Swiss-Prot record:
The chain crosses the membrane at residues 33-53, 77-98, 113-133, 178-198, 226-246, 288-308, 320-340, 347-367. Belongs to the cytochrome b family. Keywords: Electron transport, Heme, Iron, Membrane, Metal-binding, Mitochondrion, Mitochondrion inner membrane, Respiratory chain, Transmembrane, Transmembrane helix, Transport, Ubiquinone. InterPro entries: Cyt_b/b6_C, Cyt_b/b6_C_sf, Cyt_b/b6_N, Cytb/b6-like_sf, Cytochrome_b, Cytochrome_b_C_euk/bac, Cytochrome_b_N_euk/bac, Di-haem_cyt_TM. Its cofactor is heme b. Component of the ubiquinol-cytochrome c reductase complex (complex III or cytochrome b-c1 complex) that is part of the mitochondrial respiratory chain. The b-c1 complex mediates electron transfer from ubiquinol to cytochrome c. Contributes to the generation of a proton gradient across the mitochondrial membrane that is then used for ATP synthesis. The gene is MT-CYB. This is Cytochrome b. PROSITE patterns: CYTB_CTER (PS51003), CYTB_NTER (PS51002). Heme b b566 binds at H97, H196.
Length: 379
């Protein structure tokens, strides 16, 4: 008798994606982050749903409702901190996942890569709007500063900002719409994840060697299900250590002060996972230039497949490109540090140099390294 999972219309789809999926036999732990991201998204939707049951998106009660969740709701504090720190874990996994794609040349699967970039933007937008919801000082001023950047758009800028605000400043209308979008975007992200997987399973996964693995595939279950479960357990362990021992480690103390439009915090900065982009934005003195650099810092990923000059797919056997890749990682860490520093000497100069280096590595050095490595192969 044929197994039901292979004939049932719905089970058949799940079976071909998670059970009988032919998978390269040599994929390393770097390939775990896809499933970890799925776990993070599920966790965020679940904890977010419970928070939404108690949250009120009104400027007068938003801050109090978050306090109420932490003090009065059964296990509300753990749900709130799992949601807040879950976002940090989400972004750690996201950046690892993108980094893996860059290192091993997974961007050659262009449809999967491009859907991934759209997903990245969706999740970044969700996280930004979520940061506004507690209506603390950093929520309010972060929303004001970031939405104000749209005023740099020529001709329609001011109208665009006021349209997004729903008034002449960040106020009740802004908070309500941000809550609505923050609620719906993760579900849109879930749909995009399905499309991401659809395109991935059309071609099959890449692997560390970068060569075709068609001749050596193994079923996803049990080999990679058990590996993914181990990864998920480690993720949950890390998250719970963070939640239980230092839940506010990655947050901003200013967000425990209720939003006050009349008092500007000394240093307005976003959550740590946006600091690298914020540093790039701040490193350009011109407003429009800064906004474009901010967008390009992520959009640059879309042209990476066009800049691939090497005859080899991944960087596993390309030492020059490897050095450049880790230089890029160090540069991004430097930008993250600079984004959290005040705008004064020497941080301004370091930020500008790090921003120039970021674009130069991706646009100039890496393609040149690929050509050099091709020539070395001829010797």
């Amino acid at each position: 008798m044929t197994n039901i999972r292979k004939v049932h219309p719905l089970a058949k789809i799940i079976n071909s994606s998670l059970i009988d999926l032919p998978t390269p036999s040599n994929i390393s732990a770097w390939w775990n982050f896809g499933s970890l991201l799925a776990a993070c998204l599920a966790l965020q939707i679940l904890t977010g749903l419970f928070l939404a049951m108690h949250y009120t998106s009104d400027t007068t009660t938003a801050f109090s409702s978050v306090t109420h969740i932490c003090r009065d709701v059964n296990y509300g504090w753990i749900i709130r901190y799992m949601h807040a720190n879950g976002a940090s874990m989400f972004f750690i996994c996201l950046y690892m996942h993108v980094g893996r794609g860059l290192y091993y040349g997974s961007y050659t699967l262009t449809e999967t890569w491009n859907i991934g970039i759209i997903l990245l933007f969706t999740i970044m937008a969700t996280a930004f709007m979520g940061y506004v919801l507690p209506w603390g000082q950093m929520s309010f001023w972060g929303a004001t500063v970031i939405t104000n950047l749209l005023s740099a758009v020529p001709y329609i800028g001011t109208n665009l900002v006021e349209w997004i605000w729903g008034g002449f400043s960040v106020d009740k209308a802004t908070l309500t719409r941000f809550f609505a979008f923050h609620f719906i975007l993760p579900f849109m992200a879930s749909a995009l994840v399905m499309v991401h997987l659809l395109f991935l399973h059309e071609t099959g996964s890449n692997n560390p060697s970068g060569i075709s693995s068609d001749s050596d595939k193994i079923p996803f279950h049990p080999y990679y299900t058990i590996k993914d479960i181990l990864g998920t357990l480690l993720l949950i362990l890390t998250l719970m250590l963070l939640v239980m021992f230092s839940p506010d480690l990655l947050g901003d103390p200013d967000n425990y002060i209720p939003a006050n439009p009349l008092s500007t915090p000394p240093h307005i900065k976003p959550e740590w996972y946006f600091l690298f982009a914020y540093a790039i934005l701040r490193s350009i003195p011109n407003k429009l230039g800064g906004v474009l650099a901010l967008l390009l810092s992520i959009l640059i990923l879309a042209i990476i497949p066009l800049l691939h000059t090497s005859k080899q797919r991944g960087m596993m056997f390309r030492p020059i490109s490897q050095c450049l890749f880790w230089l890029l990682v160090a540069d991004l860490l430097t930008l993250t540090w600079i984004g959290g520093q005040p705008v004064e000497h020497p941080f301004i100069t370091i930020g500008q140099l790090a921003s120039i280096l970021y674009f130069t590595i991706l646009l100039v050095f890496m393609p040149i390294a690929g050509i050099i490595e091709n020539n070395i192969l001829k010797w």
